[in-house]
Amino acid sequence: MTALDTLRGKYIEAISSAADEAALEEVRLAALGKKGEISLKMRELGQMSPEERQTTGAALNRLRDEIDASLRARKQGLADAALDARLKTEWLDVTLPGRPRRAGTIHPVSQVMAELTAIFADMGFAVAEGPQVESDWFNFDALNIPPEHPARQEHDTFFMARAEGDDRPPHVLRTHTSPVQIRAMQAQGAPIRVIAPGRVYRMDMDQTHTPMFHQVEGLAIDRDISMANLKWVLEEFCRAFFEVPSVELRFRASHFPFTEPSAEVDIRCSWEGGQLRIGEGDGWLEILGSGMVHPKVLAAAGVNPDEWQGFAFGMGIDRIAMLKYGIPDLRAFFESDLRWLRHYGFAALDMPDLAGGLSR
C-alpha cells in the first residue's frame, strides 16, 4: 500500500465518521485546505523529476477529486438527514382551511352605474359619453341657461383659464352630463334614447356634496312622447333599482332652464330603525329632476321642435347609491379607505342583470 493509498483511506474514513457539517468542514480543511496534506503534497511536485511528477501528479489529482466528491456527497447526506429529523418533529394538519387571498371589490358607484345601465338597456336606452371639459356653449348656452343664471357664476362652476389675450369664453368642468345629450342629438338626430352617466363638477363640499360627483341623465326623443311616458320610465326604473314590487312617485312642479314643463320627483318611503324603506310609509324623498325637453334645447341640437319632442331626467348616482345601500356620508366615496371599500364593495364577478338580480 502506497502513501497515497494510506492517505486516501484516512480521509475517506474521516469523512464517513463526520457527524455534522462542522466536523466535515474540519476534514476538508485538513485534506484540501491551503495547509492540508493533499495540498502540501501537490506543492512538492515541483521538486520531483519529470517522470515522477507525471505519475505522482496524476495520482494526486485523482485523490483530490475523490476526496472532494466524497465531501460533497457526505454534506448532502447530512443535510438530508437534518431535514428528515426536522420533518419528524413537525406536523401539518391538512384539513385546515387555506389562507384567504384578499380580493378587490367593485366600488359602489361603479356597481350602481352597472345597475342603472342594465335597467335602462332593458328599456331600449343606449349609453352615451362625452368630454368632462366642456365649452361654455355645450354646458350652458345649448341648454337654454342664460348668462345671468347663478350656475354660470364662478362660485358655482370650475372655469378653465384661457391663455393671456384669448377673449373666447372659457371652458368649464362640466356641471352636469346634459352636454352629452346635446352631442348625442347632433350626432344621431331623432328618434333617440340615451343615458349619460359620468363625473360632473361643482364648487360644493359638505356631508352630502363634493366638488366632484357622479350623475346620470336620460333623454328620449320621438314624435308622440309625453309626460306619461316619462312617468312610466321613472317608475319602472325605481321599482327595478330599489328591488321592490311597486313604487309611488310624486311629481312637483319646478323650473329647469332645459325642460318645460319641469318636475322634481319624490318617492314614497319610510324610516324604520334608521333604515330607509322604499315604496311604503307616509314619507316622501326627493330623488331626481325631470321634464319635457325645452324646444330651444332641441333646436340648439339640430332637432326640429315642431316635429319632435321628448323628456329628460337627471339624478345623482352617488345619492341613489347612498339611499339603496345605507351609506351615510358622501365624502367617504372618494377617500379610498380600504376598510370602507371592503364593507360596501361588491364582488368583482357579480355583474348586475335583471334576470339574476341587480344586487346579490
Curated annotation (Swiss-Prot):
Secretion signal, residue range per the UniProt entry: none
Molecular function terms from GO: ATP binding; magnesium ion binding; phenylalanine-tRNA ligase activity; tRNA binding
Catalytic activity of the protein: tRNA(Phe) + L-phenylalanine + ATP = L-phenylalanyl-tRNA(Phe) + AMP + diphosphate + H(+)
Keyword Oxidoreductase included in the entry's annotation: no
Co-factor binding comment: Binds 2 magnesium ions per tetramer.
Entry EC number(s): 6.1.1.20
Name the record gives this protein: Phenylalanine--tRNA ligase alpha subunit
Family the entry assigns: Belongs to the class-II aminoacyl-tRNA synthetase family. Phe-tRNA synthetase alpha subunit type 1 subfamily.
Top EC category: ligase
Organism: Cereibacter sphaeroides (strain ATCC 17023 / DSM 158 / JCM 6121 / CCUG 31486 / LMG 2827 / NBRC 12203 / NCIMB 8253 / ATH 2.4.1.)
Keyword Magnesium belongs to the record: yes
